[in-house]
UniProtKB/Swiss-Prot annotation:
Source organism per UniProt: Caenorhabditis elegans
Transmembrane region(s): 33-53, 64-84, 111-131, 146-166, 172-192, 234-254, 266-286
The keyword Transmembrane helix is assigned to this record: yes
Gene name of the record: sre-6
Pfam families hit by this protein: Sre
UniProt-recorded name of the protein: Serpentine receptor class epsilon-6
Length: 366
């Protein structure tokens, strides 16, 4: 990391220091591993965006915030790739001013994107607070102004925090404490919102409040509980990675030992990459619609390719492969009609035999 009283890098290591302590070769190996993980993460996020755009597994307002949460990673990944390129090629030896401008742009982009990720959890919970306040109309009216309001508040805060961090306007302790407090506060607020919705839902069963709530309000409160429980399952990993990454960021900036600074920096970047890889997996696991689609695609791609194709045949061994679906449907219904007719004839014959037997018995008794 290169930092001074005027400018602070978030994810960059001074190559001169690396050469001095003779760590260039192991760091290049670690960077190669990070690049491989970033390629895997890119494919993972493309698939996650396919699920986000294909299936509406949550309210549209929460859906918009998740699109922003996942979308920032593409810009963060591109900027990190630029920094890694210059890290591999020893940017300190490049005297072209355009290289320096590109490094600064990548640094600003990555820092802003990471601050968006670090601040997202409380804003996801704020959306659930609005859903609780507007329980009667939240599903019908949508209230698209809510995510716009939250984003219009969050983005300036994240941009200002990133610029303040880079330009060293505040101490690293200020940034670290604020981010940790925001994330822990968001988790506590989620617990409170969940309990409020459960208490509100339980009050419906009492005779005292039975007629005070409409059917749409009851449905929305049930959806709030379901969504809050879903968010509670995934917020644990988000909280852990946010607090861990911020702690490493603080450790990196307060360490006086060059080796400790580099270890903290590398650990921070690897942890951010793992953070980006784990979060979509957890969301997919706890979202039933996404899980079913993932299982379906898994069977379609990996299992069916290893299974022998069996041709459909009639009871007489004739193949039933038809290029035209209309012909196939006609053959199916013709066979079905033939089977139904045969069963009806068998029942009719059986009934006729039974009737004949009864008549013969009657004649004997006479």
């Amino acid at each position: 990391m290169s930092s001074s009283s005027e400018y602070r890098f978030l994810t960059y290591i001074n190559g001169t220091v690396v050469d001095y302590i003779e760590w260039r070769l192991p760091l290049q190996f670690i960077y190669s591993f990070e690049v491989g993980m970033m390629v895997t993460n890119f494919l993972e996020y493309v698939y996650t965006f396919y699920l986000l755009l294909r299936f509406r597994a949550m309210h549209s307002n929460l859906h918009i915030l998740l699109l922003l949460y996942g979308g920032q990673y593409f810009f963060s990944m591109i900027s990190r790739a630029v920094l890694l390129y210059f890290q591999f090629h020893d940017a300190e030896s490049m005297n072209d001013p355009s290289f320096a401008d590109l490094i600064y742009t990548a640094n600003y982009t990555r820092t802003i994107c990471l601050f968006v990720a670090f601040n997202m959890l409380p804003f996801l919970v704020f959306e659930r607070c609005f859903a609780t306040c507007f329980a009667g109309t939240y599903e019908n009216d949508r209230h698209y102004w809510i995510p716009l309001l939250l984003i219009s508040i969050m983005m300036p805060v994240c941009v200002f925090s990133a610029v303040a961090y880079i330009n060293n306007w505040f101490s690293i302790y200020t940034h670290g404490i604020l981010l940790i407090v925001l994330n822990i506060g968001g988790s506590l607020l989620l617990i409170i919102v969940t309990k409020c919705n459960i208490r509100l839902h339980n009050s419906y069963s009492t005779l005292e409040h039975h007629g005070l709530y409409s059917l749409s309000e009851r449905f929305q409160v049930s959806e709030n509980i379901k969504t809050c429980q879903w968010l509670s399952r995934i917020q644990g990993s988000i909280l852990f990675f946010n607090v861990a990454c911020v702690s490493l960021l603080v450790l990196e900036n307060v360490s006086m030992n060059d080796k400790m600074v580099i270890v903290s920096n590398v650990s921070f970047n690897i942890l951010c990459t793992i953070y980006a890889a784990v979060t979509p997996i957890i969301v997919i696991i706890y979202t039933p619609e996404w899980t079913r689609e993932t299982i379906r695609l898994w069977h379609l791609i990996f299992l069916l390719s290893n299974t022998d194709q069996l041709d459909l045949r009639t009871t007489f061994g004739e193949e039933m492969n038809y290029s035209d679906k209309n012909i196939e449907s006609k053959v199916y219904f013709d066979q079905l009609q033939r089977n139904l007719t045969e069963e009806a004839m068998k029942k009719s014959k059986k009934k006729h035999r039974s009737s004949s037997w009864n008549n013969s018995e009657h004649e004997i008794f006479l």
